């Protein structure tokens, strides 16, 4: 069952963000652990498309989803990431319905969007030409489109963003949201919680998946609302793993 099918049936999906790891084998570790996806960060990470291509091809071959947070809303970023084999796109700082429509425009083929057709690339498992209709339909059905909500303006426009055809998930970026709301880093402030609740309500109203990439305390608050669940990063996992080695050995 694809991630979009899981979300449509009311199931939760689980993943984390990758900012450092470049070995395609990471997809095996994530799949073995029961995760549904990994999301590679091109907004704050240093990935290039050549590296991402190799990771995505591996994931696709084993039936594991690889998503990308692109650096910005643009045809170049979205279309190239998808042609490299990404099965989901997240655009940071999505603030308006107009921006949401532009995301869909570049992420979806006609009749939903205007994504350009690159023949025989990773997204079609390198199958040659003559399969346009099939490839386009498969991609439109599979690719997950995520609008990241990170500002007060985005919260104000959450209803319109959630109503946009082709947007599958609205995912909260709690750190930047707290900065925009004038409470930088105070993620459990009621102002932040209330803002996030408005986004969750908009998702429920329009039948879109609500997502969080946050700590355990915030997940606890919104556990009945969220479907697209993200915790931690590869950096956090490395740091905590090394710390655990030292602490464990000291106690023996």
Please give the residue ranges for each predicted region.
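Glycine-rich tight-turn/loop motif centered on a GG-T
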Residues: 86-88, 109-119, 180-193, 232-234
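Conserved N-terminal beta1-alpha1 strand-loop-helix module at the mouth
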Residues: 1-66, 70-73, 105, 145, ...
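C-terminal helical cap(s) of enzyme catalytic domains, especially alpha/beta-barrels
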Residues: 55, 97-113, 234-252
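Alpha-helix-loop-beta-strand connector modules within alpha/beta enzyme cores
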Residues: 49-83, 105-113, 137-140, 188-211, ...
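Conserved anion-binding
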Residues: 76, 88-165
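N-terminal amphipathic alpha-helix/helix-capping segment at the start of soluble metabolic enzymes
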Residues: 1-17, 129-141, 197-205
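Catalytic cores of alpha/beta
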Residues: 28, 68, 73-87, 91, ...
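Structural preference for beta-strand elements that scaffold enzyme active sites
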Residues: 13-15, 36-37, 65-67, 87-90, ...
């Amino acid at each position: 069952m694809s991630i979009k099918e899981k979300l449509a049936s009311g199931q939760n999906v689980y993943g984390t963000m990758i900012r450092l790891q470049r070995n395609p084998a990471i997809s095996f570790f994530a799949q073995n652990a029961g995760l549904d996806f990994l999301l590679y960060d091109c907004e704050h990470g240093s990935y290039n498309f050549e590296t991402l291509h190799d990771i995505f091809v591996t994931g696709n071959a084993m039936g594991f989803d690889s998503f990308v947070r692109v650096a910005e809303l643009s045809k170049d970023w979205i279309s190239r990431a998808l042609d490299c084999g990404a099965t989901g796109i997240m655009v940071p700082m999505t603030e308006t319905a107009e921006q949401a429509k532009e995301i869909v425009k570049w992420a979806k083929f006609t009749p939903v969007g205007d994504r350009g057709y690159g023949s025989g690339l990773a997204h079609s498992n390198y199958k040659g030409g003559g399969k346009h209709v099939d490839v386009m339909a498969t991609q439109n059905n599979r690719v997950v489109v995520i609008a990241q909500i990170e500002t007060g303006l985005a919260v104000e426009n959450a209803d319109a963003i959630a109503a946009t055809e082709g947007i599958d998930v609205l995912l909260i970026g709690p750190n930047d949201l707290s900065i925009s709301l004038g409470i930088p880093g105070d993620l459990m402030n009621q102002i932040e919680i209330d803002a996030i609740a408005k986004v969750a309500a908009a998702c429920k109203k329009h039948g879109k998946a609500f997502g969080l990439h946050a700590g355990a305390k915030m997940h606890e608050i919104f556990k009945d609302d969220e479907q697209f669940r993200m915790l931690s990063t590869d950096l956090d996992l490395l740091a905590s793993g090394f710390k655990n080695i030292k602490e464990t050995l000291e106690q023996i």
